[in-house]
From Swiss-Prot:
Active site: D256
Known function: Nucleotidyltransferase involved in the post-translational modification of proteins. It can catalyze the addition of adenosine monophosphate (AMP) or uridine monophosphate (UMP) to a protein, resulting in modifications known as AMPylation and UMPylation.
Family recorded in the similarity comment: Belongs to the SELO family.
Cofactor(s) recorded in Swiss-Prot or TrEMBL: Mg(2+); Mn(2+)
Domain of life per record: Bacteria
Binding-site list for ATP: G94, G96, R97, K117, D129, G130, R180, R187, D266
Name assigned to this protein: Protein nucleotidyltransferase YdiU
Length: 491
């Protein structure tokens, strides 16, 4: 491994506990040097939350750190090994262009990974160049910060630097490196890698590390690995329900993109739904619609079943008993997901208490929205505002009938109409990272070196539930339908 210029570490107290795991789980790998690093965007709010020195990170040494040109004294950068089912097909993977620089502890004691994405080739690059380009890195920055604003667990972006290098794709593009912050980068695919190419002892080491890092309560449970499985099932059910509630379509729900921490990761072909349609797909490579909006909950169950399979040797020494335990845990996913999703949908309609008829009320509204090609976000936004004029869906007889049933439903709870409206405002965003507004910001930044458009969008996305300061510009719909919008795995 080539030696790197070292920054005497007076600013960040980084360590790397992951290297205490079996060696086959990672490869020591320094980032590649880049030609001319320039800090394009820096997340001051995130840096402050993490207790990091903004002065250092924006200095020449800080920019060199973000680019991978210099490493901090005492750190051991690594690329992580993992496998995964990609569109249902199992394969060996690993960090092909991402390098874990180290871990830091925030001011409240939480541990976070610092990873450089686009930092050069690794032993897992599989013929790739290990590089990333500016547009997709800025896109991940925008979407991940938008998700954070929406209250959805997510990896975050600390900075994007341009590299001054050309990167060859279908055309020549500007190179870039993104600094990603995550509670960890342990994936379902990490467990699949050890399950297929490791020993039971190595699997146990990974599971114990994961428990210690994310689920310390497991120290007090009977079988901690059953607890681990159940907690991951719970966190994924909750995460995917949150995606569905805001119309987020991940686009590439492969098992290597399922984090054990329950954070959203990998924003390559993701997008937000405009017109409500469960069959909505944006990813250019998802030809059969495997990861369509309406399929995401059941794909979540499929991915979790793959995770459960990896844990079988730890669930019980008797394989039949272990399988029964795993099946019992996985069988709870559907009810968990439905509980989280229906609770969220009730909140979007200002409903506090639960009634069995609520499910029919919710599904009826979605059916009407689909029929009239209603915008998902703005339908709930306008319901919240009571703005029901001049929109086809609201003037239809079907909606008027539904509306009376909804209003009658609201009378069957103790809370006032004002309290119901407050609940709706907390759960129905006025803005989302609309696909065409994101593209608008990227074009200005990448082609014109104008980051003002991106910054204005980021400012709006910081508080998408703020009804006191709505920006109509970011709520307007694209002139053409969202069906024409396609995303690519650039990140």
């Amino acid at each position: 491994m080539k030696n790197k210029e070292v920054i005497v570490n007076n600013y960040l107290n980084l360590e790397n506990t992951y290297i205490k795991l079996p060696k086959k789980l990672f490869s020591e790998q320094n980032p590649s040097e880049v030609k001319s690093a320039k800090l394009e965007v820096f997340n001051e709010s995130l840096a402050s939350d993490l207790g990091l020195s903004e002065e250092f990170l924006q200095s020449d040494d800080g920019v060199a750190f973000f680019a991978g040109n210099k490493i901090l004294e005492g750190t051991v950068p690594i690329a992580q090994a993992y496998a995964g089912h990609q569109f249902g097909h199992f394969t060996m993977l690993g960090d092909g262009r991402a390098i874990l620089i180290g871990e830091l502890k925030s001011q409240n004691g939480e541990r976070f990974d610092i990873q450089l994405k686009g930092a050069g080739r690794t032993p897992y690059s599989r013929g790739g160049d290990g590089k990333a380009t500016l547009g997709p890195m800025l896109r991940e920055y925008i979407i991940s910060e938008g998700m954070y604003g929406l209250g959805i667990p997510t990896t975050r972006s600390l900075a994007v630097v341009s590299t001054g290098e050309d990167v060859m794709r279908e055309e020549i593009l500007q190179g870039a490196v993104l600094t990603r912050i995550a509670k960890s980068h342990i994936r379902v695919g990490t467990f699949q890698f050890v399950s297929n190419w490791g020993t039971v002892e190595e699997l146990k080491a990974l599971a114990d590390y994961t428990l210690n890092r994310h689920f310390k309560k497991a120290e007090y449970e009977g079988n901690p690995y059953i607890y681990l499985l159940n907690e991951v099932i719970k966190s994924q059910a909750k995460l995917i329900s949150k995606w569905q509630l805001v119309g987020f379509i991940h686009g590439v729900m492969n098992t290597d993109n399922v984090t054990i921490s329950g954070e959203t990761i990998d924003y390559g072909p993701c997008a937000f739904m405009d017109v409500y349609d469960p069959d909505t797909v944006f990813s250019s490579i998802d030809i059969k619609g495997r990861y369509a909006y309406g399929n995401q909950p059941k794909i979540g169950a499929w991915n979790l079943a793959r995770f459960a399979e990896t844990l079988l040797p730890l669930l019980d020494k008797n394989l039949e008993v272990a399988v029964e335990i795993a099946q019992n845990s996985i069988s709870k996913y559907s009810d968990l997901y439905n509980k989280y999703w229906y609770t969220g949908m009730r909140a979007k309609l200002g409903i506090f208490n639960e009634e069995e008829e609520d499910k029919k009320l919710i599904q009826s509204l979605l059916t009407i929205m689909k029929r009239f090609k209603s915008d998902y976000t703005n339908t709930f936004r306008n319901l919240t505002l009571g703005n029901l004029s001049d929109i086809d869906v609201f003037t239809s007889e079907e909606f008027k009938t539904w509306y009376e049933l909804w209003k009658e439903r609201l009378t069957r709870q103790d809370q006032s109409s004002e309290e119901s409206n407050k609940l709706m405002k907390k759960n129905n965003p006025t803005v989302i990272p609309r696909n065409y507004r994101v593209e608008e910001a990227l074009v200005a930044a990448v082609k014109d070196n104008d980051y003002c458009v991106m910054q204005r969008l980021l400012d709006v996305l910081k508080d998408p539930y703020d009804y006191s300061n709505m920006n109509e510009y970011y709520s307007t719909l694209p002139k053409s339908t969202s069906c024409a919008y396609k995303t690519y795995c650039g990140t």
